[in-house]
Amino acid sequence: MIEAAVTADAPATGPASARTLPALTQSKPARFATIMVLYFLQGVPFGLTTVALTAWLSAQGATPVEIGAFVGFALLPWSTKLFNGLLMDRFTFKPMGRRRSWILSAQFLMIAALLAMAFLAPTANDIMTLSALCFALSLCATFNDVAVDGMAVDIVPSDERTAINSVMFASQFAGIAATSAIAGSLLMAGDLRVTALVLAGIVLIATVFVSLFCERPGERLMPWSKGEASPECLKRQRSAFWPIISGVFRSLFKRHVLLLLAGMACIQSSDAFADAVAPTLGVQHLGWTSEAYSNFGAMISLVIAGAILVLPAPLKMWLGPRMAVIVPVVMAALTAAAASFTFPYWQGSNEFVLVEALMRILSWVAAIGLISWTMQICNPAIAATQFALFMAMNNFARSGYASVSGWVVEAGGYPAAYFAVSGWLVVGLVLIWLARVGDETLVTNHDD
């Protein structure tokens, strides 16, 4: 099992010893707070793109095919995270740590993308420009995401992994909820410019907070500050691409890893439904306003945040790591199948709310267990690339499902979309079972 390079509460040395704020490796509260804030910010592009803007576009008459294409293109950068990881494992400004310079740069690029959105302020009729702006925002956010994931694998002790995974994604869903509610209300007033400016302000405030903590004692807070590269950074940072690529491919071409990748990709069908199909179902079929759907998305995100904060650890303890993943996936597949067969008899919104909540909560409880497992099988020296590969496959599947979901709806209606989700979840279930998730004999000790 991977062990963190340092332990919490280690004594400060060097230039950082005079600072009042601890390094992330020294303080568990600092680690958790920083990672929570960074993951909260990852909720900004997701909440804006997959909830607020999709509801807004649906209210303006966009078809399921157009919504699916918009979401698929806007989320596409999340499937390219492998290349981000390669860059980060190869290049960094070492005096600021392995990941911090990338994180702060990504935050400022997110602000720039939101300011560009505010300046251009495309209307709902200019869906191509809106898609391009959301693509740019997602691209900036992926650098932040990969850097944070790599930092988590790098500095979080193994006994904190399950807890930190729950906190990470609970924070992301809190960010999605906040963004959905704020952006939904502002877009209802018809002002994309103000929406983008408000979100840019939120990202800026969070960036200031994150900039207060260095990764390890003695490192620089800013490029112009005093400090030097830590021994851990110098030891782990690669000086060439080939060792990174060869290490990733050695870890990839194993039966259980390939099965795990395919299974995780199949489970993403549930999120893709929420991204691309649910907005038109709620706004156009059920007659909700765009603000009502955005508020619903915010509420569901908060419920998911609470569920993944509370449920994964006890489920893992009671059921074991494998069944803690299998059971939620089985329940999600049954929920989607039931929705498919009962959809013609739905009398209003209650059935949609219940089904959407159950499918998303169950799929994400399973996802937390899977992500925790992938962190265990990652090598810290190439963590950004290796972990990014797992997440890139997930996000590519999510983007792909979203892109074609509109065609499924137009060909067979919403029951067909629910049935497709159920089918993909069953396939994912079989693959996850064959991948032997939770089998400790598959975890390799990594030498840095």
Task: Describe every region a protein language model picked out.
Residues 12-29, 218-260:
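Juxtamembrane intracellular "pre-TM" segments in multi-pass secondary transporters
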Residues 78-81, 162-181, 393-402:
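Glycine-rich segments within core transmembrane alpha-helices of 12-TM secondary carriers
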Residues 80-97, 187, 307-322, 409-410:
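Helix-to-loop junctions at the C-terminal end of transmembrane segments
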Residues 103-124, 330-347:
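C-terminal ends and interior cores of transmembrane alpha-helices
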Residues 323-370:
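C-terminal transmembrane helical hairpin of 12-TM major facilitator-type secondary transporters
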